A protein has these predicted regions:
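Acidic anion/phosphate-binding donor-loop and adjacent secondary structure
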Residues: 65, 69, 152-157, 170-191, ...
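A conserved mid-protein helix/loop that constitutes part of the nucleotide-sugar donor-binding site
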Residues: 15-23, 199, 203-222, 239-245, ...
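A short, well-ordered alpha-helix in the C-terminal region of glycosyltransferases
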Residues: 190, 325, 332, 339-353, ...
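Aromatic "clamp/platform" in nucleotide-sugar-dependent glycosyltransferases that forms part
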Residues: 260, 279
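A short, active-site helix/loop in glycosyltransferases that binds the activated sugar's phosphate group
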Residues: 138-165, 173-177
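Short hydrophobic beta-strand element within catalytic cores of glycosyltransferases
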Residues: 39, 296-299
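Conserved acidic donor-binding segment of nucleotide-sugar-dependent glycosyltransferases
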Residues: 311-312, 316-323, 332-337
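Short His-centered aromatic/hydrophobic patch
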Residues: 88-96, 112
Length: 375
């Protein structure tokens, strides 16, 4: 018997959560789990991607953040396709999925990829998202967090009277092919007009305050006084793009902002350092990709990041929201090739532990635990 599982996600961008969902959908054992996908954004780029990969995807468009109108077509879909379980990703999906589950007496669970309070540029929207997350938790059959740090935060805000079923399941990534590392390095540098002699500090992610790219820009400004051939490579797009461009241009910093780039992992060999300056981070899927590419890593010591890497063993971890700490860590790697080599080798070994097979197996077992209890 194969259980029918509907995954719900906003799908307005293609970030770590979307990549996580895609990896799950492509790798479930179809004899156990038949996955369905629903996106909540009308012109969803993620839906376009999944459809191009042959994944059946349905749009349940939300007209505004608290629009519960899609619950009606969701109920119809669940009945028609005999859905056994709804798996929600993100605050909006959790609101609709939990409400649909409650109305149908249908099991539902959520994966918390990042803390909802920090997912919005607006403070009040973040607080509202957190309020709704906590108020609708009693409607949930279970919650997955992608790090123990998120698990701790989750439980600290949960009422003791609510018997929360929750589990940490770490993200997994495919084994990417970096065998032509030098060719990839030269190709992407040429594509973006980066000189072969330049030292490149790069990052990948949505351009959002929680990702802390402004602190990386400030660090590069300081480092540019020491290294004349430094270049900042930012792969991603988002609401902070104009602000970052204005800052970098005003300070005469050599930089490239590519915008959204599919399969951005391929560009990692173009970097001499990968930096993740997040203010808050659930886990940091891209860190595992950088580790596979054997690019030295500098990252904020926040959220689930120190669960992946130890400071000075696999990466240099710095204080979040601190450009001076970030600059000092980057400088240490630039000045010490032997340290960089040790860090990359150790991080590469760690990255091999975070497989998709393990993530899919743990997720499937959690489904079965919930569905067995229901039965």
């Amino acid at each position: 018997m194969s259980f029918q599982v509907l995954h719900l996600i906003g799908g307005g961008e293609i970030g770590g959560a979307e990549q996580h969902v895609l990896n799950l959908l492509k790798n479930f054992n179809q004899q156990q789990i038949t996955p369905h996908l629903g996106c909540l954004v009308k012109n969803s780029p993620f839906a376009s991607l999944t459809r191009s990969r042959g994944i059946k995807t349905t749009i349940f468009p939300m007209r505004f953040p608290l629009d519960i109108g899609p619950v009606i077509p969701l109920i119809s879909y669940c009945r028609t396709h005999k859905i056994d379980l709804i798996h929600c990703h993100g605050a909006r999906a959790a609101l609709l999925g939990r409400l649909t589950g409650k109305l149908l007496s249908l099991p539902n669970l959520s994966t918390i990829h990042s803390w909802p309070e920090f997912d919005y540029t607006s403070v009040w929207k973040g607080r509202l998202a957190l309020f709704l997350e906590q108020k609708t938790q009693p409607w949930s059959s279970g919650i997955i967090t992608v790090s123990d740090a998120l698990q701790t935060t989750l439980r600290s805000g949960t009422k003791p009277s609510f018997p929360l079923r929750s589990k940490t399941i770490y993200n997994g990534i495919p084994q990417y092919d970096f065998s032509e590392h030098q060719i990839m390095r030269s190709s992407f540098r040429q594509q973006w007009g980066i000189k072969s002699t330049q030292k490149v500090i790069g990052t990948i992610g949505r351009l959002h305050p929680v990702k802390g790219q402004i602190y990386l820009a400030e660090a590069i400004k300081a480092l540019s006084q020491v290294y004349a051939d430094l270049h900042l490579l930012i792969i991603g797009d988002g609401p902070l793009r104009s602000e970052l461009q204005n800052y970098l241009t005003a300070n005469n910093i050599s930089y490239t902002i590519t915008g959204y780039y599919p399969a951005a992992w391929r560009a990692l060999p173009a970097m001499d350092i990968f930096a993740l300056p997040s203010v808050s981070e659930g886990m940091g899927l891209v860190l595992l990709e950088a580790a596979q590419a054997k690019v030295p890593i500098v990252a904020s010591n926040t959220g689930g990041i120190p669960e992946l890497f130890n400071h000075r063993r696999e990466a240099l971890l710095c204080r979040p929201a601190d450009s001076e700490s970030l600059a000092a860590a980057c400088k240490e790697i630039l000045d010490n090739p032997d340290l960089a080599k040790v860090l990359t080798e150790n991080a590469w070994q760690i990255s091999k532990l975070f497989t998709i097979d393990r993530m899919v197996k743990d997720t499937t077992n959690f489904y079965l635990e919930i569905l067995t209890d229901k039965g």
